[in-house]
Design a protein with these regions (language model features):
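Bacterial N-terminal signal peptides that target proteins for export
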Residues: 1-11
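Bacterial N-terminal signal peptides
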Residues: 10-19
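Boundary at the C-terminal end of the N-terminal hydrophobic targeting segment
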Residues: 21-28
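Acidic/histidine-rich, surface-exposed loop or edge segments in extracytoplasmic proteins
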Residues: 33-49, 116-130
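Extracytoplasmic/secreted envelope proteins and their assembly/folding machinery
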Residues: 54-58, 62-65, 139-143
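Sec-exported extracytoplasmic/periplasmic mature domains
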Residues: 62-70, 147, 151
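Short, intrinsically disordered low-complexity segments
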Residues: 73-105, 176
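Glycine-rich, aromatic-bearing surface loops/beta-hairpins
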Residues: 141-182
Length: 182
C-alpha cells in the first residue's frame, strides 16, 4: 500500500514538474526579431463621464500609447475642435502617429529587424500616474480602437465604466505586448 502511494506521488510530481517547465518556457522567452510598423489614426472620443479638450485628449492618448508599448517618438496631436485650444469639447479629436513592434513573420514592412520581447502592461487608476478613474471610458475606447494595432497576447480585460459617474467604475486592463528589447 505504501509503495502504491509512493508511486502515485512520484507520478504526480513528475506531471507537475513537466507542466511547470512548459508554462515557464511559454512566459520566459528570450529576445525575438521584430520590425516597426507605422500607424496613423484619427481618434474621436465620445464619452459621458469626462469631457476633454482636444489638447487634453491628445496628451492622455500619448500616455496610453507609450504605456502600451509604442515607440518613444509616438505623436498625438489635437484635432480640429469646435471650441478651441484648452476648452472641453464633447467631440474632442486627436490624430495619432506611432510605431508598434511586430514579429518579423507577420509584418509587411521593409524596416531593419530589431530585438523584441514580450512585456507585461497593466493599465489602472494612477498606473500610469497620469491616468485617473475619470479616464475609464477613454481607456475602453483605446482598448477597442487602438490596442488592436499592437501585437498583444493574454489580454485580461476587467474594465467596468459606469456612464456619468466615477463610483463603480474600474480601470483594470492587463496584457502582454511585443515591445523593444531593453
Amino acid at each position: 500500500m505504501t509503495s502504491l502511494r509512493a508511486l502515485q506521488l512520484s507520478c504526480v510530481l513528475i506531471i507537475c514538474g513537466v507542466t511547470m517547465a512548459a508554462s515557464a518556457s511559454e512566459t520566459a522567452t528570450g529576445p525575438e526579431q521584430g520590425v516597426w510598423q507605422k500607424h496613423e489614426y484619427s481618434f474621436q472620443f465620445l464619452g459621458f463621464t469626462t469631457t476633454y479638450s482636444c489638447d487634453g485628449l491628445a496628451s492622455k492618448l500619448k500616455v496610453l500609447l507609450i504605456a502600451a508599448g509604442a515607440r518613444a517618438d509616438a505623436k498625438s496631436t489635437s484635432g480640429a475642435c469646435s471650441r478651441g485650444y484648452g476648452t472641453p469639447d464633447k467631440f474632442a479629436r486627436a490624430y495619432l502617429k506611432f510605431y508598434t513592434l511586430s514579429a518579423v513573420g507577420t509584418a509587411d514592412n521593409a524596416s531593419p529587424p530589431i530585438s523584441g520581447t514580450w512585456r507585461s502592461v497593466a493599465l489602472a487608476d494612477r498606473s500610469p500616474r497620469e491616468l485617473r478613474l475619470g479616464d475609464c471610458e477613454l481607456v475602453e475606447q483605446f482598448r477597442d480602437k487602438v490596442l488592436p494595432m499592437f501585437t498583444t497576447r493574454n489580454i485580461d480585460n476587467r474594465m467596468t465604466c459606469v456612464p456619468n459617474q466615477l463610483s463603480g467604475s474600474v480601470i483594470n486592463l492587463k496584457f502582454e505586448v511585443f515591445a523593444k528589447f531593453m
